[in-house]
Design a protein with these regions (language model features):
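Terminal low-complexity/charged segments
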Residues: 1-206
Length: 206
């Protein structure tokens, strides 16, 4: 067991939950969401611990709908060559939000954005919390949540609108845009623009 766990318990008491040693030998300690920022600052700044490098931030959702979403922070002390994982549980019936650690480790910026993008977890105090893998206007959910369909979820009509909006003079084939069956959903002006395209033909019944 990583000795930082006993030091955390002595300092933060009940804010520190269970701890275990994973199969790879690393210690995982669970921390209450409200005390996360204080614990992380202590781990970074306290002599003899000094976790100065945030390796990763990720999230896990299990098949059991009753289990909370888990946020996992991978910390590394470069000076001591020691690793520690800090885990926070977020019950799904509560707000999926907790404090950002960007103020402690600048590298958390993109890591937290990815968790937000894929799982919908909000990080309070993040300087620029927006999607990072999906496009910013994507509004079809969070792709790594268990309720997200394996086939994905997107609007083909919206895909075409964005493509034509970015380059209205371009010609697109139906193979490129994959919207043949969504043609009827498009507004009339866009249908006309697509009909005038030089590449590909659109099946329509008018």
């Amino acid at each position: 067991m990583n000795p930082s766990v006993d030091a955390l318990r002595a300092t933060f008491g009940n804010a520190i939950g269970r701890a275990l040693v994973a199969r790879d030998g690393e210690t995982i300690v669970t921390v209450g969401r409200d005390g996360l920022l204080g614990v992380m600052r202590w781990l970074r700044d306290t002599a003899g611990h000094s976790y100065d490098y945030l390796v990763d931030v990720t999230a896990v959702e299990y098949r059991d709908a009753e289990r909370p979403i888990e946020l996992v922070y991978f910390l590394r002390s470069l000076e001591r060559r020691a690793d520690l994982r800090v885990k926070v549980e977020l019950p799904k019936e509560q707000e999926l939000a907790l404090d950002s650690v960007v103020g402690l480790w600048a590298g958390a910026d993109w890591l937290e954005r990815e968790v937000y993008d894929m799982f919908g977890v909000t990080f309070r105090g993040h300087p620029d919390l927006r999607r990072i893998l999906m496009w910013e206007t994507y509004a079809e959910g969070y792709p790594l949540r268990k309720d997200f369909p394996l086939r994905g979820r997107f609007s083909r009509a919206e895909q075409v609108r964005q493509a034509l909006g970015a380059n209205p003079e371009a010609h697109y084939s139906m193979e490129e845009l994959s919207i043949a069956e969504a043609f009827a959903e498009l507004p009339e002006d866009m249908k006309q623009r697509l009909r005038q395209g030089e590449r590909g033909k659109i099946p329509f019944s008018e």
